[in-house]
Amino acid sequence: MLDRLQSLEDRYNKLNEMLSDPEVINDSKKLREYSKEQSGLEDVVQAYREYKEVTEQLNDAKEMMEDKLDDEMYEMVKAEIAELNGRKEELESSMKILLLPKDPNDDKNVFMEIRGAAGGDEAALFAGDLYRMYSRYAEHQGWKIDVMEASSTGVGGYKEVIFMINGSDVYSKLKYENGAHRVQRVPETESGGRIHTSTATVAVLPEAEEVEVEVHDKDIRVDTFASSGPGGQSVNTTMSAVRLTHVPTGIVVSIQDEKSQIKNKEKAMKVLRARIYDKFQQEAQAEYDENRKSAVGSGDRSERIRTYNFPQNRVTDHRIGLTIQKLDQIMQGKLDEFIDALVMEEQTNKLEQIGE
């Protein structure tokens, strides 16, 4: 492990030199590429440097113990050694995690697709609640949201809402939200006070760059139509809505959010590229999972991952068996407790696999 850490520090130092080179500074592509690589090494290199410093201090302290010390000095050095040993162990654990293979999509922006599933109007209302929950979480993180397409029910609910989240390491945190989310609550229209169960599905797709997914014009069928609002009424007499069909995969994307056909087509193309990329990723993951299961949960969109029980103010994540009695705060976007636990679970799984 130490040899690998040393080679990473050498690479980090080399990147520092390269980023000071006028030739690189004037080449925006190289500058971006090297800056991104350096940023990815920052945490592990800092941990390794501290580890070397702590190891040196520990060796010095052990040498001191070999000298003739009075009782007071002996106890001081002994306490320092215990403290340094503790810190060294912490850094070793931290570096093991930092050396785990990273998901290449972790630093990407995402498209989120939320759909009301079982439960009719109540499912659509819950889909709206989830959209607002993720919007608030994105706000807390300093991320930016752009709605691509929304099919609202007119009472704060959504049959479907597709939105993009731009920011730092978005996919690394939101990838765990893939799956079916179940809600248990008394609908406002329920006079008897009975608890109803409804479901909404969430899909999280990493943004795909053009170089990652080659989409040929000849493979895309483009249809245009007049956009419509809630209930199907026409809101635009021009043919501004766009439907793209990727013939080889059968993936269809319809966007009518903008008044401009060009803008709708641009948005649809981004979503289409992400869905095609996601399809390839899912197929590759399914093949990998036949031999070994590495992720938290299966990532299956139909897998029930979480239950939100409003009467009891609790949320349970079924993948890790974690229940939190703070539903009101979670619906305000306070998702860190769940996300941190899911990240830790995945890291533990990966460490166990390495040890096998």
From Swiss-Prot:
<feature type="modified residue" description="N5-methylglutamine">
    <location>
        <position position="233"/>
    </location>
</feature>
<dbReference type="Pfam" id="PF00472">
    <property type="entry name" value="RF-1"/>
</dbReference>
<comment type="function">
    <text>Peptide chain release factor 1 directs the termination of translation in response to the peptide chain termination codons UAG and UAA.</text>
</comment>
<dbReference type="InterPro" id="IPR050057">
    <property type="entry name" value="Prokaryotic/Mito_RF"/>
</dbReference>
<comment type="similarity">
    <text>Belongs to the prokaryotic/mitochondrial release factor family.</text>
</comment>
<keyword id="KW-0963">Cytoplasm</keyword>
<dbReference type="InterPro" id="IPR004373">
    <property type="entry name" value="RF-1"/>
</dbReference>
<dbReference type="InterPro" id="IPR000352">
    <property type="entry name" value="Pep_chain_release_fac_I"/>
</dbReference>
<dbReference type="InterPro" id="IPR045853">
    <property type="entry name" value="Pep_chain_release_fac_I_sf"/>
</dbReference>
<dbReference type="GO" id="GO:0005737">
    <property type="term" value="C:cytoplasm"/>
</dbReference>
<dbReference type="InterPro" id="IPR005139">
    <property type="entry name" value="PCRF"/>
</dbReference>
<keyword id="KW-0488">Methylation</keyword>
<protein>
    <recommendedName>
        <fullName>Peptide chain release factor 1</fullName>
    </recommendedName>
</protein>
<keyword id="KW-0648">Protein biosynthesis</keyword>
<dbReference type="Pfam" id="PF03462">
    <property type="entry name" value="PCRF"/>
</dbReference>
<dbReference type="GO" id="GO:0016149">
    <property type="term" value="F:translation release factor activity, codon specific"/>
</dbReference>
